UniProtKB/Swiss-Prot annotation:
This is NADPH-dependent reductase BacG. CDD domains: BKR_like_SDR_like. It is found in: Cytoplasm. One of its GO terms (biological process) is antibiotic biosynthetic process. It is an enzyme of class 1 (oxidoreductase). The gene is bacG.
């Protein structure tokens, strides 16, 4: 059997980088993406330093842009000839509320993440069908089920992604292609550290107090690591996860209270 090929978006930092490193440990051929060429080249160097024999292709570009997306998938097909795993990992839009949201920003967020994920799945699945195998993992978030008052648009778009993913999973299941959503909670990434700063400013408290306040709302009393999230993604990308599809799985230390 040929080595599996995985395409990881947003792989220059945080969860995306951790997933790329984890899949490299498991001997996947990798296509890694980020908007910043220098940053993603640095990740390639990290992978090759640990796995000199690894196959790593860098394709820089903004995956929220339709034309960039089309070009990158064309390159994956021409340079790899196959695609087995897709990690959809694009950040959402800026915080907003129902009172201050506007149509322009809502439309931009919908295009930036929701439409981009669905289009990427459409393009990736056409390649996966050639080998009757595929693993599609959408990085979403718990806001889809427990909306945040200050994340009005993102909460709504995440719910749309969960719904679309469930629908798509039914269509692709006969082709042995699974589609699942991975929903991180508070994970120690740059985005989390920005959130800590916002809590500090809002409450006029120290960084330590802000982090303690956040951790107090998590049953495990700590934030997660990108590596813990990557371990779950790697399992969903594996042969062992062959009967898991159409699911929404949280890596959040028990934060989500709904069932």
């Amino acid at each position: 059997m040929s080595k599996r090929t995985a395409f990881v978006m947003g792989a220059s930092q945080g969860i995306g980088k951790a997933i790329a490193l984890k899949l490299a440990d498991q001997h996947f051929s990798l296509v890694i993406n980020s908007r910043n060429l220098d940053n993603i080249e640095s990740v390639k160097e990290d992978i090759l330093a640990k796995h000199p024999e690894a196959s790593v292709i860098v394709l820089a570009g903004d995956m929220s842009d339709q034309h960039t997306r089309a070009g990158i998938f064309q390159k994956i097909e021409s340079q790899c000839g196959r695609l087995d795993v897709l990690i959809n990992n694009i950040p959402g839009g800026a915080p907003d509320t129902f009172d201050n949201c506007n149509i322009e920003d809502m439309t931009a967020t919908f295009t930036q993440k929701t439409v981009a994920y669905i289009d990427a799945i459409k393009r990736a699945s056409s390649l996966m069908k050639q080998n009757e195998f595929g693993r599609i993992i959408n990085i979403v978030g718990n806001l889809w089920k427990e909306p945040g008052a200050n994340m009005f648009t993102n909460s709504m778009m995440n719910a749309a992604l969960i719904n679309a993913s469930k629908n798509i999973s039914i269509q692709l299941a006969p082709h042995n292609i699974t589609v699942n959503c991975l929903n991180p909670g508070f994970i120690a990434t740059d985005r989390y550290h920005q959130f800590v700063e916002n809590v500090m400013k809002k409450n006029s408290i120290s960084k330590q107090k802000a982090e303690e306040q956040i951790a107090s709302g998590i049953p495990m009393k700590r934030v997660g690591s990108a590596e813990e999230t990557a371990a779950l993604a790697a399992f969903l990308a594996s042969e062992e996860a062959s009967y898991i599809t159409g699911q929404q799985i949280s890596a959040d230390g028990g934060s989500m209270k709904s069932i």
